[in-house]
C-alpha cells in the first residue's frame, strides 16, 4: 500500500475514533441553548454534565447562576438581559443570551363553564328549497351564497342578529325589489343581490337559507390573570356544528355550569361531559376572541376552584419535561379536582402551534369514571413542578386515555397578556 494512502487511512481512523469519544460531549455542547427566557424570581435549569464553568459576562443584576454536577441553574432577579458565558479550562466555549422578564403568575382554573357565542352578523349554515308558484327555488343558493358565509349587511344596514333579517326580506318581497347583501367569506367581503320568493304554503317571503346568530356549549376554564382579570379557556377554537368553520365572534359570555353525568369514552368513541347551564345564570365573564388556542376575554369577578386558588408561575414551552404532571377538571357537579397524568412528549416551540405536547391520563379514578379525556375537558389546566404549563385540547379517537395539549405560552399571548413586553422593548 503506498505511503500516502496509508497515512490517509490512518487519519480517517483517528478522526473516527476521536468522533466516537467526543460524541456525547459534542451532543451536550450542541444542546446548550444560545438563548433562554426566565421570569424574575423563577429558576430554569440547563441540563449538562460537561465540566464547564458558567458565569455572567459582566457584573449583571439580571440573574444569578449556580452550577450543580448535572445542571446549571439560572434564577431571574431583575428584568433585562445579559449573557451567560461557559468556559473550559479558562477558555470561553459558548454563550447563552438570557432574557429576564417581569414576573408573571396566573390562577389556574379547572371550573366547568357554559359558553355562549354571538357571531358577527348571521351565519349561513345551509339551504332549503321554497315551494313557489314556479317550482322549488333557493334564492340564496342561486345568488352564489355558500354555507359558512356571514351576512353582515342588508341594503346597507348592519345585521347583528336573526331578528334583523325578516323585515328586510318581507319588504323586498312585497315590493319586488332585490336585496343588496354584503357577505363575509373567510377574509373576503362580497356583494351580491337576491330577490325573495313567496312560499306558497305559508304566504311569507323566504330567501332559502338556514341561518344562525349564536352557539352554545361547555368547556373548562384554563386560567385568569388576577391583575387584569384576563382569562383563557378551552384551548381550541369553537367551530359551527354544521359548517365546521370557526365562529367569528362579535361578543359572548361565559357562565358557571354543572356536570350532571359522564358518557365514558372507549376506543373509537370519545366520551363526553354532560352539563347544564341556564340562560338566566349570572354571567361571569365576556368573550371577545375565538382563536385556534381557545376563547378569551375578561372576567367580571374572580372565580375560585377551592383547590388551587393561589397564583402559580407559568412555564415556557422549553421548560416542559416528559414525566408526571396534573390536570384540574370537574367530573361531578361543580367540584374541581386534581388528577394525575403523564407528559409523554413535548415540543419546545419558537412559534405558536396548537399541538405542543402529548399527554396520557394515569389517574385510576379518572380512568374509571371517564375512560380518559372526554369532550368538555378541553381547557383543563396542566400543572407540572408547581407551574402552569398548558391545557388539555384534544383526545385521540382510538385511544381516549391520551391526547394533545397546548403550551400555556400561546394561550397567554392570545389573551392579550404580553409576557415578552420588556424583552421586545430592549
Curated annotation (Swiss-Prot):
Residue stretches making up the PDZ domain: 101-187
Region (PDZ binding): 393-395
Gene3D superfamilies: 2.30.42.10
Outcome after substituting residue 363 to L: Inhibits spore formation
Residue ranges the record assigns to the propeptide: 29-52
Span of the signal peptide: 1-28
PROSITE patterns cross-referenced by the UniProt entry: PDZ (PS50106), SPOIVB (PS51494)
Location of the active site: 236 (charge relay system), 363 (charge relay system), 378 (charge relay system)
Organism superkingdom: Bacteria
Regulation: The zymogen is inhibited from undergoing autoactivation by BofC. The protease is inactivated by proteolytic cleavage.
Consequence when changing residue 394 to D: Sporulation deficient spores
GO molecular function, one term: serine-type peptidase activity
Alphabetical GO biological process terms: proteolysis; sporulation resulting in formation of a cellular spore
Annotated ranges, domain Peptidase S55: 188-426
Location(s), subcellular: Forespore intermembrane space
Reported impact of residue 395 to E: Reduced binding to PDZ domain and sporulation deficient spores
Reaction catalysis annotation: Self-cleaves 52-Val-|-Asn-53, 62-Ala-|-Phe-63 and 74-Val-|-Thr-75 at the N-terminus of SpoIVB
Transcription recorded as keyword: no
InterPro entries: PDZ, PDZ_6, PDZ_sf, Peptidase_S1_PA, Peptidase_S55, SpoIVB
Keywords: Hydrolase, Protease, Serine protease, Signal, Sporulation, Zymogen
EC number: 3.4.21.116
Subunit note: The PDZ domain mediates interaction with another SpoIVB protein during transactivation. Also mediates interaction with BofA during cleavage of SpoIVFA.
Function in brief: Plays a central role in the sigma-K checkpoint which coordinates gene expression during the later stages of spore formation. The protease is activated by trans cleavage of the zymogen precursor producing SpoIVB-45 kDa. This undergoes further trimming by cis cleavage to form SpoIVB-43 kDa and SpoIVB-42 kDa. The protease then cleaves the C-terminus of the SpoIVFA metalloprotease activating the latter.
Protein name per the record: SpoIVB peptidase
Amino acid at each position: 500500500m503506498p505511503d500516502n494512502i496509508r497515512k490517509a487511512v490512518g487519519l480517517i481512523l483517528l478522526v473516527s475514533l476521536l468522533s466516537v469519544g467526543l460524541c456525547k460531549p459534542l451532543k451536550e455542547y450542541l444542546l446548550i441553548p444560545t438563548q433562554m427566557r426566565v421570569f424574575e424570581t423563577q429558576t430554569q435549569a440547563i441540563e449538562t454534565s460537561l465540566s464547564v464553568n458558567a458565569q455572567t459576562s459582566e457584573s449583571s443584576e439580571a440573574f444569578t447562576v449556580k452550577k450543580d454536577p448535572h445542571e446549571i441553574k439560572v434564577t431571574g432577579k431583575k428584568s433585562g438581559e445579559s449573557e451567560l458565558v461557559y468556559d473550559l479550562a479558562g477558555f470561553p466555549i459558548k454563550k447563552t443570551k438570557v432574557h429576564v422578564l417581569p414576573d408573571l403568575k396566573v390562577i389556574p382554573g379547572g371550573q366547568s363553564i357554559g359558553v355562549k357565542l354571538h357571531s358577527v352578523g348571521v351565519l349561513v349554515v345551509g339551504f332549503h328549497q321554497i315551494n313557489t308558484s314556479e317550482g322549488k327555488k333557493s334564492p340564496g343558493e342561486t345568488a352564489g351564497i355558500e354555507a359558512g358565509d356571514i351576512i353582515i349587511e342588508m341594503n346597507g344596514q348592519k345585521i347583528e342578529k336573526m331578528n334583523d333579517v325578516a323585515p328586510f326580506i318581507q319588504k323586498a318581497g312585497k315590493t319586488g325589489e332585490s336585496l343588496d347583501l354584503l357577505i363575509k367569506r373567510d377574509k373576503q367581503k362580497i356583494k351580491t343581490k337576491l330577490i325573495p320568493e313567496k312560499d306558497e304554503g305559508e304566504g311569507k317571503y323566504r330567501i332559502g337559507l338556514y341561518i344562525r346568530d349564536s352557539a352554545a356549549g361547555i368547556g373548562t376554564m384554563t386560567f385568569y390573570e388576577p391583575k387584569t382579570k384576563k382569562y383563557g379557556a378551552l384551548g381550541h377554537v369553537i367551530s359551527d356544528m354544521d359548517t365546521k368553520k370557526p365562529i367569528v365572534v362579535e361578543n359572548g359570555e361565559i357562565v358557571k355550569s354543572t356536570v350532571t353525568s359522564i358518557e365514558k369514552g372507549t376506543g373509537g368513541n370519545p366520551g363526553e361531559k354532560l352539563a347544564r347551564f341556564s340562560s338566566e345564570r349570572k354571567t361571569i365573564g365576556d368573550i371577545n376572541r375565538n382563536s385556534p388556542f381557545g376563547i378569551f376575554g375578561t372576567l367580571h369577578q374572580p372565580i375560585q376552584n377551592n383547590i388551587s386558588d393561589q397564583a402559580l408561575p407559568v412555564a415556557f414551552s422549553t421548560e416542559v419535561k416528559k414525566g408526571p404532571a396534573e390536570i384540574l377538571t370537574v367530573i361531578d357537579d361543580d367540584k374541581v379536582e386534581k388528577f394525575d397524568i403523564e407528559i409523554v412528549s413535548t415540543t419546545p416551540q419558537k412559534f405558536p402551534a396548537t399541538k405542543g405536547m402529548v399527554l396520557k391520563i394515569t389517574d385510576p379514578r379518572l380512568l374509571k369514571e371517564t375512560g380518559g379525556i372526554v369532550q368538555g375537558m378541553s381547557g383543563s389546566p396542566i400543572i407540572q413542578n408547581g407551574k402552569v404549563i398548558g391545557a388539555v385540547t384534544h383526545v385521540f379517537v382510538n385511544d381516549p386515555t391520551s391526547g394533545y395539549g397546548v403550551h400555556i405560552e400561546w394561550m397567554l399571548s392570545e389573551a392579550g397578556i404580553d409576557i415578552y413586553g420588556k424583552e421586545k422593548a430592549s
